[in-house]
């Protein structure tokens, strides 16, 4: 991407993993001529005495002819979303200690897993990423997330018997939520006539929703506005008809019992004035293509209060703004950068 854009590059290395200088040096050498785009280094997540690190900084600068323009200290609980799913690879991850247990099925090819970070700012939620049948079967809400390869993840989920665990959770009264690729998995069938995602042309879904999905050769990518239109009072009391914001990024189109939400696509294939149906609900399960739906504070609190009601707990007021929490976290990161990074160097390589 940097080569296509003709952009300068700063190489960032996390020192807490070990071997940071070897990693930086090796990357520059392996890139060959393209390595000339790398203008400097940032050392990230440093703990300890900077004077002890200085010989290493001098060494990498002398060996590659590029400066280290900053050493960022390790900042615990910065409050920003994880960069990728590496944090989920070491088995079960659980954060929070609330009364509402939410389990996200940790698919092998999970995507957009930060969709569920907003739950971490709620005082009554325990959020867990897991493939444990016991965790899934005893959750108050199970989320089937998006996937980079929906068909493969669906087949792997079935091979592990987690389809049975999800149904057990539903039969015990848990709410099942399916987002994007998870929404496609939750339907009756997935058709892949062009073999976009696999060599399997047709696969049975989980049968939780009355929809079928067909993969085409084009991808939907757009921001959306939405409102609940299908049985809103029964589906989610307290946010009837409220406007929601999010985005779509998926292959495939679904058909069937669709119309839980009415959406307007703000970019991509349709004009803002065009309203389209999205989402489906049946029994204790609902699903949608809308990523970022839980960043809508009133909607998120409404979902949680419905779960509290089922547990015999009083509702909580919606006093948490996820957007404001993210902005404060970004401000803290900006303060760290101003304090520990040569911003003047960055401006110079950008020609500012």
Residue ranges and their predicted role:
Residues 7, 66, 171-175:
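A short helix->loop->beta-strand "cap" motif at the edges of active sites that frequently abuts
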Residues 1-15:
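Inter-motif core of Ras-like GTPase G domains
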């Amino acid at each position: 991407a940097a080569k296509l854009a003709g952009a300068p590059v700063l190489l960032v290395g996390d020192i807490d993993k070990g071997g940071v200088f070897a990693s930086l040096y090796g990357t520059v050498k392996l890139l060959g001529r393209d390595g000339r785009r790398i203008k400097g280094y940032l050392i990230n997540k440093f703990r300890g005495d900077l004077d002890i690190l200085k010989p290493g900084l001098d060494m990498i600068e002398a060996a590659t002819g590029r400066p280290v323009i900053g050493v960022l200290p390790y900042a615990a609980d910065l409050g920003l979303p994880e960069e990728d799913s590496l944090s989920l690879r070491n088995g079960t991850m659980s954060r929070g200690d609330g009364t509402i247990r939410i389990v996200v099925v940790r698919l092998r090819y999970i995507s957009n897993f930060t969709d569920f970070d907003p739950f971490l700012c709620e005082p009554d939620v325990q959020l867990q990423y897991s493939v444990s049948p016991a965790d899934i079967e005893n959750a108050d809400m199970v989320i089937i997330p998006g996937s980079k390869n929906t068909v493969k993840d669906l087949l792997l989920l079935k091979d592990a018997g987690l389809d049975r665990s999800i149904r057990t959770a539903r039969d015990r009264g848990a709410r099942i939520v399916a987002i994007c690729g998870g929404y496609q998995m939750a339907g009756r069938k997935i058709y892949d006539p062009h073999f976009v995602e696999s060599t399997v042309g047709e696969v049975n879904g989980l049968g939780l929703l009355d929809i079928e999905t067909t993969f085409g050769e084009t991808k939907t990518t757009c921001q959306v506005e939405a409102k609940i239109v299908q049985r809103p009072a029964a589906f989610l009391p307290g946010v009837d008809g409220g406007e929601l914001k999010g985005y779509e990024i998926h292959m495939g189109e679904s058909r069937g019992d669709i119309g839980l939400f009415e959406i307007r696509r703000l970019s991509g294939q349709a004009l803002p004035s065009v309203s389209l149906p999205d989402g489906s609900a049946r029994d204790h399960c609902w699903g949608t293509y809308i990523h970022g739906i839980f960043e809508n504070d009133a909607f998120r609190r409404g979902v949680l209060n419905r779960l509290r009601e089922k547990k015999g707990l009083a509702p909580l007021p919606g006093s948490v703004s996820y957007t404001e929490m993210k902005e404060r976290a970004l401000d803290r990161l900006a303060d760290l950068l101003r304090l520990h990074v040569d911003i003047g160097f960055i401006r110079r390589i950008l020609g500012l």
